[in-house]
Amino acid sequence: VTRIIAGSAGSLRLATPGPTTRPTSDRVREAIFSRLEAREGFHGTILDLFAGTGALGLEAASRGARHVVMVEHHSGAQKVIRRNIATVSPTLPSATTLQAVSARVESYLQAPPTLTVDGVFL
């Protein structure tokens, strides 16, 4: 079971698209975010590239990121990301924006929107 670990959406379960997409495990996400929060926290814009379920980007939003862009090409994973956004959004501050982009990461990075990005997950 994949879930949001901490923050405003802590313990909410996330949908997964099936065996072809493997979300980052709770244990790995917990280690990543513990380390990052000790350094700087999450308050700006996060890119979640090859987003899969969106778990990393949604975890960042739950912990305070103001804007999260999740880029994923696979249509099944895109549907799951949109479902997970719908699950997590009501728990976030109204100023938080979550964006799902259906594109190949390589194409997205060739002409990205003009954003100041504070963190990138690959």
Regions of interest found by a model, annotated:
Residues V1-L122:
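Class I S-adenosyl-L-methionine-dependent methyltransferase catalytic core
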